[in-house]
Amino acid sequence: MWLELGAMLRTTCGPLGRAVRLPCAGALRLRPHWWGPCRDCLAQRVHQDQPGRGLTEDEIRRAREARLRKAPRPQLSDRSRERKVPASRISRLASFGGLAVGLGLGALAEVTKKSLPGGSLQHEGSSPFLTEANAERIVQTLCTVRGAALKIGQMLSIQDNSLISPQLQRVFERVRQSADFMPRWQMMKVLEEELGKDWQDKVASLEEVPFAAASIGQVHQGVLKDGTEVAVKIQYPGVAESIQSDVQNLLALLKMSVGLPEGLFAEQSLQTLQQELAWECDYRREAACAQTFKKLLADDPFFRVPAVVEELCTTRVLGMELAGGIPLDQCQGLSQDIRNQICFQLLRLCLRELFEFRFMQTDPNWANFLYDASSHKVTLLDFGASRAFGTEFTDHYIEVVKAAADGDRDRVLQKSQDLKFLTGFETKAFSDAHVEAVMILGEPFAASGSYDFGAGETARRIQGLIPVLLRHRLRPPPEETYALHRKLAGAFLACARLHAHIACRDLFQDTYHRYWASRQTLPLPAAS
């Protein structure tokens, strides 16, 4: 757990996919725009034999003018390519098998080259498996199969190079920035299976090329018949059924070829990851979570949640109101005051989610937070990884944070045992390292004035503790903490990247008193 948290604090979370917006097929004249009016030729009507009323020229003009007034939209990565998703387990296994053979042949060629007079590895001391050719094989395979395998690759991209080799980190950084999208026929098949053959009756138009492609699905821009712009997320076929096998195949392959560090993916963390991926593949669950957050944040002055489009929601298709804005990592050019406000609100949201709602969207991807400068609000996206927290967990967890904020090391140790982080039989080296890690993370809540997130060395200090924490841990941490600490680390990282100065102590103290007031009881004493 501390390994994941420390690594998260060292680098950025992966974007959903952005850079150069690809023009629609109609604009490129590769083939007709397949449904609805072409975005770049809006007055043109194609497929007029399809059922449903198309937009009038006046409606198109008004929609275009409204779109120009709205905030920027995410854009597809220029590295993304149209590529069929292997939908069956056999075809996905074949992809991993082909990768294993390719890595072996590539490594053999590299070793052979080294054995020749004057030969050497591409990088001195590097693994023969991690040649440029093999790196490209890994990237291409993960971007082809997508699903759980690509998700793990994106997770590994944010590990610090003290945990995985710089070579492997560079490989997974390329994976993080790339995600291919499925071809038209495969996407059409999913839409027809989920929404029926008459799904076109539900929309006025839907763009053929997605504006985002990620590990589980891709997102298309569409327009309802009333002119409402929507984002339609379509899941890749086969990814939900292949979660466990994909995880096992990829990790076995990587451990065999490039040697992932011991403890990076412990058994319990793998089980938790597989459960989270299963949640993310259930779009009906995600729609329900989005609606829950929309109610919880209905009166919030800073955050908004797009409306769910019920008629476009199934297990593998999710329609929501289209949102505009820029991801958090693109807010660095804003004024110090605006950056402080954004980060303050982000931390306030995290504390509300955990200690007021006890329901949190745990994906720290910066593309899930879109800042709209015109309204000075942030739109929240992607609720697939949302989860609830029980009161027993939050009762103890808030006391751990409170002890760290108060600088009480003994109470941090005791409350960590109450939380079942520790058994009480750990070595002194482990207990000291655990307490020190908690105290480091509690520093923003202990500072009497504004805390300068950009000036701290939080990540480096925690990284130094990780070897001890891995070597001497007697029990896995509570399963709730895997996702929780990813989210908190992502929030701290955003504050550091934006060089925010925030008075965190008052924010937490207010949260603490409100929490116990809502529980109508006194803070829990330490267990004897």
Curated annotation (Swiss-Prot):
Tissue: In the kidney, expressed in glomeruli, predominantly in podocyte foot precesses, as well as in proximal tubules and collecting ducts (at protein level).
Binding site for ATP: S215, K233, M320, E321, L322, A323, N368, D382
GO molecular function: ATP binding; protein kinase activity
Record-listed E.C. numbers: 2.7.-.-
Topology of this chain in the membrane: Single-pass membrane protein
Gene Ontology CC entries for this record: cytosol; mitochondrial membrane; mitochondrion; plasma membrane
Motif range (AAAS motif): 212-215
GO aspect biological process, one term: ubiquinone biosynthetic process
TM regions (residue ranges): 93-109
Chief location bin: mitochondrion
Domain Protein kinase stretches: 187-419
Motif (KxGQ motif): 151-154
Entry annotation: catalytic residues: D363
Pathway(s) where this gene product acts: Cofactor biosynthesis; ubiquinone biosynthesis
Entry keyword set: ATP-binding, Cell membrane, Cytoplasm, Kinase, Membrane, Mitochondrion, Nucleotide-binding, Transferase, Transmembrane, Transmembrane helix
Class of enzymatic activity (EC top level): transferase
Protein location: Mitochondrion membrane; Cytoplasm, Cytosol; Cell membrane
Statement: the UniProt record of this protein carries the keyword Cell membrane: yes
Domain notes: Adopts an atypical protein kinase-like fold: while it adopts a core fold similar to that of well-characterized protein kinase-like domains. The KxGQ motif completely occludes the typical substrate binding pocket. Nucleotide-binding opens the substrate binding pocket and flips the active site from inside the hydrophobic core into a catalytically competent, solvent-exposed posture.
Cited function: Atypical kinase involved in the biosynthesis of coenzyme Q, also named ubiquinone, an essential lipid-soluble electron transporter for aerobic cellular respiration. Its substrate specificity is still unclear: may act as a protein kinase that mediates phosphorylation of COQ3. According to other reports, acts as a small molecule kinase, possibly a lipid kinase that phosphorylates a prenyl lipid in the ubiquinone biosynthesis pathway, as suggested by its ability to bind coenzyme Q lipid intermediates. However, the small molecule kinase activity was not confirmed by another publication.
Quaternary structure (record): Homodimer; homodimerizes via its transmembrane region. Interacts with COQ6 and COQ7. Interacts with the multi-subunit COQ enzyme complex, composed of at least COQ3, COQ4, COQ5, COQ6, COQ7 and COQ9.
Family statement drawn from the similarity comment of this UniProt entry: Belongs to the protein kinase superfamily. ADCK protein kinase family.
Protein name: Atypical kinase COQ8B, mitochondrial
Protein's organism: Rattus norvegicus
Lineage: Eukaryota, Metazoa, Chordata, Craniata, Vertebrata
